[in-house]
UniProtKB/Swiss-Prot annotation:
Keywords: Coiled coil, DNA-binding, Metal-binding, Zinc, Zinc-finger. This is Zinc finger CCCH domain-containing protein 18. Gene3D superfamilies: 2.30.30.1190. Residues 40-69, 430-500 form a coiled coil. PANTHER family: ZINC FINGER CCCH DOMAIN-CONTAINING PROTEIN 22. Residues 77-105, 230-276, 351-390, 406-432, 482-504 are annotated as: Disordered. InterPro entries: G_patch_dom (IPR000467), Znf-CCCH_4 (IPR041367), Znf_CCCH (IPR000571), Znf_CCCH_sf (IPR036855). Residues 94-104, 245-254, 260-272 have a biased composition (Acidic residues). One of its GO terms (molecular function) is zinc ion binding. Residues 375-390, 413-432, 493-504 have a biased composition (Basic and acidic residues). It comes from Oryza sativa subsp. japonica. The keyword Zinc-finger applies. Residues 304-350 form the G-patch domain.
């Protein structure tokens, strides 16, 4: 009876696999048609690859079931013959083209490592924590990187009270037939400098991103530097992983992607060595990870891991050479001109235009006899024209202008005398108003900063007193600057008003 039930179960599993295989092939046909219309769609390409992998897995499982059924039938027909004689008859495909047979359920024991495919379509490394009947196994993530991937220790002790609402993982039930053999990573010197995953005990068993700084082949121990906090640790090989995901290939460990990565790393190291020959690094190979000594062309090169030095070396630069096609260095220095404070760039442009107009070989004209004669002649012609056009209105205008000029000169002399008495003999105009405005703004911002500084350092008595004293001085300077700005504003307004009256 038990044998018949086992046969019925195997037949039902075989039918389910065939049904899934047909559905996946139909989906693959639909995806192929969509790709024919849009061959550059990245999502469709990814789905196409996942469907191919799923079809391959289903075909392998179906092949294994059919092979097992045929072997049982042959054993029933020929019970007296040894199974080795029928082995060549059962083999369907050449051994080179067939994946190693999936392990029998009894070969996956509790605690053994394996590879399994998650519901997100990716392959992960896992560990068998329990068997669910004869066909399923409960798997935990071997390299958990998040809390929902970490195994719940209370569930392992059968004491978890949250059930399906637990924020930790209770394992994943996977059919044993879909499990694959675990492929360990071959750690070697060529992987130094690569980004890996490392386990740390003080982070709830989670694996963190790190960089392999060095590797000891004798002790099988690696020095890693964690990327999140910069801490370093010396960990064995079983606490290191080259990636969060497992290798999808069906080859042995010697031909896995770790070897491909090592070959790539070796090529990269050879290229780096050829580059480092012109840089003079002390340890070109051992320092390919977290570098502490580089060919320092500048002080910032220590913090950039020598990236700029490598780029310059690839372009043919050698230490001590000058830049340029023939290494001549900089020929024409960049002109530097210090501008006066609190003036716009228009001042610099005007000054440069004046210098260009004068020319390098000419002297600036300071006037002369001919210019003075020309100026006097123009004034004489203007006076003569006014006398010829003399009328009642011109007489009234001349009288008004004369009175206003006299009053303006009197006011100006009075203001100059009062300004000299107050120490403000400076001419007030719109430009001086801008200077006063900038000074007031600067003092106000300084007062705000000092007030914030005093609020932050109330507990520090010495610092608080010094800041308070500085704040009083700054406020006094601000009050003086505001008063000066107000007086200058009034003076400019009065001057503009006088100009309007003079024009009238």
């Amino acid at each position: 009876m038990a044998g018949e039930e086992g046969e019925d179960e195997a037949a039902s599993i075989e039918l389910q696999l065939e049904h899934h295989l047909q559905e996946q092939r139909a989906s693959l046909t639909a995806v192929d048609e969509a790709l024919a219309a849009d061959p550059s769609n990245a999502d469709l390409l990814e789905v196409h690859e996942e469907l191919l992998a799923a079809i391959k897995d289903a075909e392998e499982g179906l092949l294994h079931l059919k092979r097992s059924r045929l072997v049982k039938q042959i054993d029933e027909i020929f019970p007296n013959q040894e199974p080795t004689s029928e082995a060549p008859e059962v083999a369907v495909d050449p051994p080179d083209d067939v994946e190693p047979e999936p392990l029998e359920p009894q070969e996956f024991s509790v605690g053994s490592k394996c590879r399994f495919r998650h519901k997100d379509g990716r392959w992960y490394n896992g560990c068998v924590i329990g068997l669910e009947g004869s066909s399923d196994a409960r798997i935990s993530f071997l390299t958990p990187t998040s809390e929902n991937m970490s195994m719940c220790k209370f569930f392992l002790q059968q004491r978890c009270r949250f059930g399906s609402n637990c924020r930790l993982s209770h394992g994943i039930v996977i059919p044993i037939l879909s499990l694959k053999q675990f492929t360990p990573t071959r750690w070697q010197q060529s992987l130094v400098g690569s980004s890996i995953l490392a386990a740390s005990g003080h982070h709830s068993g989670l694996w963190r991103r790190a960089e392999l700084e060095s590797w000891d082949d004798d002790l099988k121990v690696g020095q890693v530097v964690f990327q999140d906090d910069g801490s370093s640790a010396r960990l064995p090989s079983d606490s290191l992983s080259i990636s969060e995901y497992a290798d999808e290939s069906d080859e042995d460990g010697e031909g896995s992607s770790s070897d491909e990565g090592s070959d790539f790393s070796e090529d990269g190291d050879q290229e780096d060595e050829s580059v480092h020959q012109g840089l003079g690094l002390l340890e070109s190979k051992n320092l390919s990870g977290v570098q502490t000594e580089t060919a320092i062309f500048a002080k910032w090169e220590h913090h950039t891991r020598g990236v700029a030095s490598k780029m310059m070396a690839k372009m043919g630069y050698r230490e001590g050479m000058g830049l340029g096609v023939s290494g001549q260095g900089m020929l024409d220095p960049i002109p530097v001109k210090v501008l006066p404070p609190k003036q716009s760039l228009d001042h610099a442009v005007a000054a440069s235009e004046v210098n260009d107009s004068v020319g390098p070989g000419k002297k600036r004209s300071r006037g002369g006899k001919r210019k003075r004669e020309k100026k006097f002649a123009e004034q004489a012609r203007a006076a003569k024209a006014e006398e010829e056009e003399r009328s009642v209105f011109s007489f009234i205008n001349s009288q008004l202008v004369g009175q206003d000029v006299a009053e303006g000169s009197a006011v100006k002399s009075k203001k100059d005398s009062s300004g000299e008495a107050n120490g403000h003999a400076k001419k007030e105009d719109r430009r001086s108003l801008l200077a006063y405005d900038d000074e007031v703004k600067e003092l106000r911002s300084r007062v705000e900063k000092l007030e914030e500084m005093m609020k932050r350092n109330r507990k520090d008595k010495a610092f608080y007193e010094a800041a308070s004293k500085k704040l009083k001085q700054t406020r006094k300077a601000l009050a003086d600057a505001e008063a000066t700005h107000a007086s200058a504003t009034n003076a400019v307004a009065r001057k503009e008003k006088e100009k309007k009256w003079l024009k009238f």
